[in-house]
């Protein structure tokens, strides 16, 4: 029995989909415990590239059962569009399970998300506009609509009417928009009821029963540590907890059942949207990382901001997630660049910080303190063992391991499933 949680260690787009795809073929369940269709990931299988947004990467595994956990917020239109797109390419989505306790994203959530971002202007967070934040806000305010509610029309209608009592006041009086008819929302949800019903289960019970039977469960966190609503660069964060603790809450798998916490981290750093980013590059190297690394957001289409590896963030992520292992991705992107700077600490108004500063104001003003290492010139995309890597590449990985305080168990040397070096296999360890 193993319960493994996968967590992004930076600001997202680290390659969690690849990690899930590699491990997902050897586990019995792959669970998405948080987020919605706001966090895309790319998986390359058999030379074909799949871009997933709401569904877990385990949907492409032939054996694993994919699950959307209770912590996910689900846009039904986006869900079935994604399913249909995969099925058109020959994928089998019939094994998908959805928690009855997951919350639903309503059309009014998307409307409010877009209107509020425009209203904020320069103070906007930079959301995807897909209604994720408003859906989570309703969940916490206890006025959200859950998956199970669409199977009882009277409860559904009552919840929608109650939610729109307040939201229509906001739309009309604050944002000068038209009120939304509750009946159109009820009809929208009911139109998906028959297709949804076969997928809905008590996922918490099913997952724990599977673990009791000695099966393997992989939890695939969305977004990343630095976007966590509590532990990230607030307020430039998502609306859920995409850290290891959040995976437990969003799946119903208790924390003592988690055997490995696997952090996914790039050999450099990227970020999409607004917010502080100490190692961000504005020169030719930033453009090089964007171009060579293919740094364009799957979900937003926005070019990612790029910077050097930040070991302060890596240590912080290891601590708040209890990482047992790291999966280092995109090492190949750094081939042939001469020297590679590594951020080892911050300078904030003349004071050195080896760990995360206490306040967001300090973090916003943090300047990176770098050490440099020589890059390698050799093509590493065909390397299959750590020993096959050029010595300079090995030295770089070992230095990141030392600075991060967590072993680098997997190393990505290309986008393909088979372009991964395995130093320690979490599924072979107790």
From Swiss-Prot:
Active site: 13 (proton acceptor), 41 (proton donor)
Organism: Corynebacterium ammoniagenes
Keyword DNA-binding attached: no
Keywords: Cytoplasm, GTP-binding, Ligase, Magnesium, Metal-binding, Nucleotide-binding, Purine biosynthesis
Binding site for GTP: 12-18, 40-42, 304, 330-332, 412-414
Residues that coordinate or bind substrate: 298-304
Functional note: Plays an important role in the de novo pathway of purine nucleotide biosynthesis. Catalyzes the first committed step in the biosynthesis of AMP from IMP.
Location in the cell: Cytoplasm
GO cellular component labels: cytoplasm
Protein name in UniProt: Adenylosuccinate synthetase
